[in-house]
Structures are given as C-alpha cells and as structure tokens.
Amino acid sequence: MTDSTYDVPRVRTYLQGLQTRIADALGALDGTPLATDVWQRGPEERLRGGGCTRILEGGRVFERAGIGFSDVAGDALPPSASAARPQLAGRGFEALGVSLVLHPRNPYCPTVHMNVRMLIATKPGEAPIFWFGGGMDLTPVYPFEDDARHFHQVCKDALDPFGAELYPRFKTWCDEYFFLKHRNETRGIGGIFFDDFSEPGFERSFEMMQSVGDAFLNAYLPIVERRAALPYGERERDFQAYRRGRYVEFNLVFDRGTLFGLQSGGRTESILMSMPPVANWRYNWQPEPGSPEARLSEFLVPRDWV
C-alpha cells in the first residue's frame, strides 16, 4: 500500500516500550533481570541502524529468554522479503520490530515466539510502501488443551475489534506457515501470523499490531505460572531436547525472519538468539505408543481451539 502518512517514530517508541514491558515482566517472574546489550551498525555497513537485545540465560524459569528490538535499513530488500512481491525487489528498506523466543526450563512449560514489525520499502521518485507483520505461536512439548484454548482465545480477543474475519484468517496463516514440510507436522499448536498488512491504512493497521503485542503477556504468562512448578525428570528433559531439534530445523530451513536477517547482513547473535540452549537428534526415534510423548502428535495438526 502506498501512503505517506505513516509515522515511524511512533512505531519505534511503541516497540521499545513493548520490549521493556515484556523484559521487566519476565525478569520479575524468573527472579533474574534480563541483561541488556545495545548494538549499533556503522553507516558504511550493508545493514545500517541498531537495536537492543534483552537476554536471560540459565534462569530459574527460563533456560533462555531473548527479546530483540531492531531498527535497521538497507539499500535492497533481501530475497526472503520480496519473493512474494517481486515488484519490491531491489527497493531500499527500513525494518523495525520486536521479536522474542522464550525457552523455559520445565518441559511442561511451552516454548513461545512473538514478533511485531513494520517495514517500509522505498524507491527514488515513487511513494514509499509500508506494511505490518507479526504474530505469536506456542510450541509445547507436553501439551495441555487448556493452555491451547487460553492462548488462542487471547489471540482472538486481540484481533476481534479489528474485524471478526482476522482471527480465522491469521490462525490459518499461522498453521500453514509454521509447518515442517519434511516432518509433515506443525511446529506447535499455532496461534496467529500475519504479513503484508496495511489494508485499513496506517492508523488502524498500527493499532492492530499494538493489540497483538499488548496481548502477549496475557496469552503466555498464565500458562507458565500454571506449569513452571510441575515435577519432571530426566525422561521429560530428554524429550524436550529432542523436540527442540524440530524448532532448530524450522528456524534454519523455513523461517523468513531468520532468512531475512542473515540475507540482509543482520547481527548474527541477535538473529540466532531464538535457538534453544540444548537440542538433540536421534535416528528414526519413535515414542512408545500410548505414552505422554506419543500424545504430542495429536496436537501437531491444525485444530480449532476456540
């Protein structure tokens, strides 16, 4: 969409505040404040700009929790950003967003991912093109139906004020996007995903993105609070590491955000903070039929949760 009325400083201020709010809440829950790593790229580099990474490793609740804010610009959109919109190939761009991945220590607590972002594509002599993207999705190891219903209900409640059609549309998009084709399974129980969103204009699109970002803590923290104290042993940790391998596979093979960052010359440490701290692979391993581990497969297909 072409529109010269967008307001990058307002978006930037919101995103920086969102990162701080989430980092403070996670630090309070874990009992360990998240460290702060501010970074900057020079004007001579392929990707210019900077950002702030909030990171916790080895915490009581979170084995790794990373929340990144970045505001970067480049001379040409990378292929991962223009593949679906070839008319944007070669345009300069600015991309700003917040992205997080949380890997809890307890296998009964699900991993979660959330991202909200804005991109502007520019070309001399033409009006800029902007769009919003983002979403959130839940990846349990030992799933609970109550958790899935709660997570999806909060996502739906965040979107409904902007149109009843958005939740089913973004929910389906999430199921299709977070799918491991080579494994024929979804990454988790889904959530919402959207990209190239600008139809209602800047103000309404920005409000919708804020609603998604603001909903995250309510979607996720009650689940962690319910599950973080459940007892577990070596068996559960082994299965958690095995399932984390699927997370690695998706992020390195399919994830457009990872590819965008690496293709555009982004900051590798920030891009790969989504990786789990421990993961493993086993040759042709299958869970015992009827076991809690086997039950996970029932959840790794698209389902209507609300």
UniProtKB/Swiss-Prot annotation:
It catalyses: coproporphyrinogen III + O2 + 2 H(+) = protoporphyrinogen IX + 2 CO2 + 2 H2O. The keyword Oxidoreductase applies. Its main location: cytoplasm. It comes from the Bacteria. InterPro entries: Coprogen_oxidase_aer, Coprogen_oxidase_aer_sf, Coprogen_oxidase_CS. GO terms for molecular function: coproporphyrinogen oxidase activity; metal ion binding; protein homodimerization activity. The keyword Secreted does not apply. PROSITE patterns: COPROGEN_OXIDASE. Keywords: Cytoplasm, Heme biosynthesis, Metal-binding, Oxidoreductase, Porphyrin biosynthesis. The record marks H182 as: Important for dimerization. One of its GO terms (cellular component) is cytoplasm. SUPFAM superfamilies: Coproporphyrinogen III oxidase. The active site is at H113 (proton donor). Residues 247-282 are annotated as: Important for dimerization. It is found in: Cytoplasm. Gene3D superfamilies: Coproporphyrinogen III oxidase, aerobic (3.40.1500.10). It is an enzyme of class 1 (oxidoreductase). Pathway: Porphyrin-containing compound metabolism; protoporphyrin-IX biosynthesis; protoporphyrinogen-IX from coproporphyrinogen-III (O2 route): step 1/1. Its cofactor is a divalent metal cation. GO terms for biological process: protoporphyrinogen IX biosynthetic process. Pfam families: Coprogen_oxidas (PF01218). Involved in the heme biosynthesis. Catalyzes the aerobic oxidative decarboxylation of propionate groups of rings A and B of coproporphyrinogen-III to yield the vinyl groups in protoporphyrinogen-IX. Homodimer. Belongs to the aerobic coproporphyrinogen-III oxidase family. This is Oxygen-dependent coproporphyrinogen-III oxidase.
